[in-house]
C-alpha cells in the first residue's frame, strides 16, 4: 500500500461520494506516476493547480501498481463517480477500461472516462490530440465533457491452467517481434534503470532475438500459414503500425509483417517513425471484425503495450462496438 494514497478534502476515503449530487458532479481522478521517473509530486502539483484554476471539483487517488489501479478504479465505480479521469499512459487506461467492462452495462453507460497523458507510452492520448505538455488545454477539453462512444478490441484465449480468459484493449495487440522488443525494454530497464540505457540495451540484445515466428492466422477469407515477423491488431493507431485504424467503426486494422532483409528492417523502422509504415512492401494490411490465431509458435503477446502471459493454443481477437463513453477534445 505504500505506492497508493487517497486525497479527498471533504471526506475520508471510506466515506467517498455517499451524496448523490456529489457523485454526479465531482471527478474521480487516478494519478499514475511514470515508473522510475523523478518529479512525480511536482507533476501532480501542476495538474492539481490546473484543475482548481478551472473550477473542477475532484477526489484524487494515486497508485503506481497495476493491482492498485484496478482496485481504485473499481472503488470509483462502486462509489458512483460519473466522471473518472486517468492521469497515466496506455497501460493504466487499459486497466480502467477492463474495470468498466466488468461492470454492468447500465453502470458503464452512466460513466464517462477521461484521460490526461502521463505514461511512458501515450499512444491513445496522442491519437485524439491530447499532449503531455498541453495540460491546460487537456483540462479544458475534459471540462467540456464532449463524449464519444468508442469501440474496444478483445482477445479471448485459454491460459496455462485451461481457464477461458479475455482482455479488452483500446489501442492494439502485438504478436511477435514488437512484443519481444517491449519485453526486452522492460527487462533491461529493470536492471539498468534509465530509459535511454534500457533502449540502447534492448537494441544490443536484438542481435540475439529471433526475427520470425511460425504462425497460422485467419483474417477474413485469407489464411496465412507461414513465418511472420510481427502482427499488430489495432483498434486505434497501434504505435504507428495501424495508422488508419479508428476506434469507432466496428472494425480492427491488422498489419502482418513478413520477414524482411536486415536493410529492409531498418527501412521499416524508419517508415514506422515517419507515419508511412504501410508503404513498406513487407507489410500486409487488413481490415476485419475478427482475427483467429490458430498458431503462433513462441510468439510473445502484448496488450496496449503491456506483456501478457502467452495464450495456450488458438485464440481470437475481435471488436465490441461503442461500449465506452470516452471524453474527447471539444
Q: PLM features: residue spans?
A:
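Short amphipathic alpha-helical segments
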Residues: 41-43, 97-100, 126-128, 244-245
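Short Gly/Thr/Asp-enriched flexible loops that form oxyanion-binding sites at enzyme active sites
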Residues: 91-105
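Catalytic core of DAGKc-family lipid kinases
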Residues: 54, 102, 106-229
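ATP/NTP phosphate-donor binding region
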Residues: 2-87, 98, 140
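Short hydrophobic-aromatic micro-motifs
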Residues: 162, 166-180, 225-234, 239-240, ...
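Internal helical hairpin/lid segments
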Residues: 227-279
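Glycine-rich beta-strand-to-loop/alpha-helix junction loops that act as flexible
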Residues: 87-89, 118
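ATP/nucleoside-binding phosphotransfer catalytic cores, i.e., glycine-rich phosphate-binding loops
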Residues: 219, 256-330
